[in-house]
Amino acid sequence: MSNIEERVKKIIVEQLGVDEAEVKNEASFVDDLGADSLDTVELVMALEEEFDTEIPDEEAEKITTVQAAIDYVNSAQ
């Protein structure tokens, strides 16, 4: 597991209050991890802060799974 992947998953666990074992790459924030729209906004904000980047709204809307978050952060680095 890459450092970025570990950091993204740690943020997801902290933000959504889910068990680390539930945070699989293919997991959907809403369908699998029980996030609502406010949770996803807070998650994007936490990712922006952790990785010192700005995620435009149109990109943030596409980040719906753990893997999508990892991929976005990797591409933004």
Swiss-Prot record:
GO cellular component, one term: cytosol
A GO MF term: acyl carrier activity
Every Carrier domain range: 2-77
PTM per Swiss-Prot/TrEMBL: 4'-phosphopantetheine is transferred from CoA to a specific serine of apo-ACP by AcpS. This modification is essential for activity because fatty acids are bound in thioester linkage to the sulfhydryl of the prosthetic group.
Pathway(s) where this gene product acts: Lipid metabolism; fatty acid biosynthesis
UniProt cross-references to InterPro entries, sorted A to Z: ACP (IPR003231), ACP-like_sf (IPR036736), PP-bd_ACP (IPR009081), Ppantetheine_attach_site (IPR006162)
Keywords carried by this UniProt record: Cytoplasm, Fatty acid biosynthesis, Fatty acid metabolism, Lipid biosynthesis, Lipid metabolism, Phosphopantetheine, Phosphoprotein
Source domain of life: Bacteria
SUPFAM superfamilies: ACP-like
Annotated GO biological process: lipid A biosynthetic process
Gene3D superfamilies referenced in this protein's UniProt entry, alphabetically: ACP-like
Subcellular location, record wording: Cytoplasm
Keyword Zinc appears in the UniProt entry: no
O-(pantetheine 4'-phosphoryl)serine PTM sites in chain numbering: S37
Record bears the keyword Lipid biosynthesis: yes
Pfam families given in the database record: PP-binding
NCBIfam families: acyl_carrier, PRK00982.1-2, PRK00982.1-3, PRK00982.1-4, PRK00982.1-5
Function in brief: Carrier of the growing fatty acid chain in fatty acid biosynthesis.
HAMAP family: Acyl_carrier (MF_01217)
Entry's family note: Belongs to the acyl carrier protein (ACP) family.
Protein name: Acyl carrier protein
The organism of origin for this protein: Vibrio harveyi
